[in-house]
């Protein structure tokens, strides 16, 4: 969880999340100990493994044939938290009435032998999910923003307003 700069929006977002899950708690994204404590208690945490969080805690592995900075946190949380990785997808319903949530089986034999193999496996899973419903993916997210050293950027520079 990252607090919003706008305190009113932050309040509205937190209230909305807590309304649907009284046991939900927003854990600051840097608070690894709190996340591990939750996992070891048999509860769940959520984060998006398909986001570009930069190179600090990432490895470059292919996603749709392009090297992508992929977080190693999935492996670390599964190992240190003694937790299963349970992927899910959500689909906006055509009539705009809501979403269909699909909770998939836990990844078997995860974590594996190496963080790199695990990152590749996560990206392959993301590829399959996105390919099934490409119109549902958040393509506006600059997934390939962080490039391997020496590789040029893939996005046009944004103009400052």
PLM regions: where:
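Conserved nucleotide-cofactor-binding alpha/beta core module
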Residues: 1-43, 54
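Non-catalytic C-terminal accessory region of glycerolipid acyltransferases
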Residues: 30-161
């Amino acid at each position: 969880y990252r607090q919003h700069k706008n305190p009113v929006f932050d309040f509205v977002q937190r209230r909305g999340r807590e309304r649907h899950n009284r046991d939900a708690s927003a854990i600051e994204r840097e608070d690894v100990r709190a996340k591990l404590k939750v996992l070891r208690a048999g509860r769940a945490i959520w984060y998006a493994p398909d986001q570009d969080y930069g190179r600090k805690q990432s490895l470059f592995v292919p996603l749709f044939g392009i090297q992508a900075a992929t977080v190693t946190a999935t492996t670390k949380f599964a190992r240190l938290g003694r937790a299963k990785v349970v992927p899910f997808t959500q689909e906006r319903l055509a009539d705009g009435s809501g979403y269909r949530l699909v909770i998939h089986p836990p990844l078997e034999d995860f974590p594996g032998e190496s963080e790199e193999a695990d990152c590749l496996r996560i990206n392959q899973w993301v590829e399959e999910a996105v390919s099934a419903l490409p119109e549902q993916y958040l393509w506006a997210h600059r997934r390939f923003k962080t490039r391997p050293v020496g590789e040029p950027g893939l996005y046009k520079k944004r103009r400052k307003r």
